[in-house]
C-alpha cells in the first residue's frame, strides 16, 4: 500500500527534486510545503506516514520541526542537510530522527531511506499490536 510522504524544505527546487524522485522511483505519494509550521499541522491532521525535512529553514528548523512532531507522533522523520556536522546529527538523533542524509545526495539514498523508514514504522505498528494482544484481559 502506498505511503503518504511529506517533504518540507524552504527551497522550491529541493521540493521539486524530492517530489520527482518519489514519484519516479517509489509507489508512494508526496505532499510538499515550504513552511515548517504548516508541516506540523499537516502531520497533526493525520495520514502522513513519513516526513523528509531540511535541517536549515527559517522560522522552525528541521531539528525543531522534529521536536514538534515528536510531541504528538512517532512517525519516522528523515533530515536532509548540506550542513552535516556530527553535532547536528547527534542533536537530531537525540530528538528521534530516523535518518540523516547529507546533500548532495543520490536518488538511491532517498529511496533507500524512505523504504527503511517505512519498514521500521510497519514493524513498530506490528510490535504494538502484538503487545496489545499479549496483555491479559481486564480482571485476570
Mark where each language-model region is:
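Active-site beta3 strand of CheY-like receiver
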Residues: 46-52
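Receiver (REC) domain active-site loop signature in two-component systems and cognate sites
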Residues: 57
Amino acid at each position: 500500500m502506498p505511503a503518504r510522504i511529506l517533504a518540507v524544505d524552504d527551497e522550491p527546487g529541493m521540493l521539486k527534486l524530492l517530489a520527482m524522485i518519489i514519484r519516479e522511483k517509489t509507489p508512494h505519494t508526496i505532499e510538499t510545503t515550504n513552511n515548517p509550521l504548516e508541516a506540523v499541522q499537516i502531520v497533526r491532521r493525520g495520514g502522513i506516514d513519513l516526513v523528509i525535512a531540511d535541517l536549515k529553514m527559517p522560522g522552525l528548523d528541521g531539528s525543531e520541526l522534529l521536536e514538534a512532531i515528536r510531541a504528538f507522533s512517532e512517525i519516522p522523520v528523515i533530515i536532509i542537510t548540506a550542513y552535516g556536522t556530527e553535532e547536528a546529527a547527534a542533536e537530531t538523533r537525540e530528538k528521534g530522527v530516523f535518518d540523516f542524509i547529507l546533500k548532495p545526495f543520490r536518488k538511491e539514498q532517498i529511496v533507500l531511506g524512505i523504504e527503511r523508514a517505512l519498514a521500521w514504522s510497519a514493524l513498530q505498528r506490528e510490535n504494538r499490536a502484538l503487545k496489545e494482544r499479549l496483555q491479559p484481559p481486564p480482571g485476570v
